[in-house]
Amino acid sequence: MSLTRVSVTAVRNLHPVTLSPSPRINILYGDNGSGKTSVLEAIHLLGLARSFRSARLQPVIQYEEAACTVFGQVMLANGIASNLGISRERQGEFTIRIDGQNARSAAQLAETLPLQLINPDSFRLLEGAPKIRRQFLDWGVFHVEPRFLPVWQRLQKALRQRNSWLRHGKLDPASQAAWDRELSLASDEIDAYRRSYIQALKPVFEETLAELVSLDDLTLSYYRGWDKDRDLQDVLASSLLRDQQMGHTQAGPQRADLRIRLAGHNAAEILSRGQQKLVVCALRIAQGHLINRAKRGQCVYLVDDLPSELDEQHRMALCRLLEDLGCQVFITCVDPQLLKDGWRTDTPVAMFHVEHGKVSQTTTIGSEA
């Protein structure tokens, strides 16, 4: 799976541009502030209908423009081309089109174009709140388990109903019990999918990490969000009074976490910034391998400022792992010489220079294997 064409209009400082990227490695280079990251942001918009740089829409849309648009053609794993498009307006409205038809949700984009982002904010996967690690986990499950999304939607609905009742007390006991049962059933299914995914992810992650850095004491464990020896419905019943006092449900898969520890301690508190980056990269590359194994296509990797925090040895090791995935990669950097020679001679590498928002292809190296 790869993007064969990307057209961008009115995204930040970028001039209107149509790119024909390599199916494998694409390096975008230029000075800081030139617009390199904005190219990755445009692709991210195309795949997820949102920016990774801003929760607000306004900064993404070019000054004095009413909307930004991104179109792309994706070559799917079955060899069929799919056309994607997204337009986002200043008022917040957005239109998603897939093969000429309006899409119902951003989930359809995500399924068609799986994206993995590695950028300076990726440290939050280790340092941030459990919600960030749940999102990482659920992204992986979503892309390998087609039954996950409808169950996750059931869970969210049941959780909203229960939390509303906890705050306002407007459900009769029978309705309350029914929603507790639904929440418990959906939670057990979500837990099973997550647990199965972690069991598959751990050995791939450990093997990938070993290629990057020696951290033998680093462990990955899963906490499901409630006592592993108790049924959730019992936990909900016993914690009802406290939940009412707090105004929300305190136990359940919405409290799950992926715990990353080194010698028994929170890894984020011990690892250097460079080591943290390598751990995050290993996690995201491992996810890519699982998607490949599930035969649901391949990820497209967006790697912002790959050289930062890494010495040459680790930089080259990371390039090799990305290359071995056999997927499409977009990488930004200031100095292209740091990455230009990190690939095999038969790997197609496209180089794009970005200057003051203008993107121009400068070189294509190698040929598709």
From Swiss-Prot:
ATP binds at G30, D31, N32, G33, S34, G35, K36, T37. This is DNA replication and repair protein RecF. Keywords: ATP-binding, Cytoplasm, DNA damage, DNA repair, DNA replication, DNA-binding, Nucleotide-binding, SOS response. It comes from the Bacteria. InterPro entries: DNA-binding_RecF (IPR001238), DNA-binding_RecF_CS (IPR018078), P-loop_NTPase (IPR027417), RecF/RecN/SMC_N (IPR003395), RecF_2 (IPR042174). The RecF protein is involved in DNA metabolism; it is required for DNA replication and normal SOS inducibility. RecF binds preferentially to single-stranded, linear DNA. It also seems to bind ATP. It is found in: Cytoplasm. GO terms for molecular function: ATP binding; single-stranded DNA binding. It comes from Pseudomonas paraeruginosa (strain DSM 24068 / PA7) (Pseudomonas aeruginosa (strain PA7)). GO terms for cellular component: cytoplasm. Disulfide bonds: none annotated. The lineage of its organism: Bacteria, Pseudomonadati, Pseudomonadota, Gammaproteobacteria, Pseudomonadales. PANTHER family: DNA REPLICATION AND REPAIR PROTEIN RECF (PTHR32182:SF0). Pfam families: SMC_N. Its main location: cytoplasm. The keyword DNA damage applies. GO terms for biological process: DNA replication; DNA synthesis involved in DNA repair; double-strand break repair; SOS response. Belongs to the RecF family.
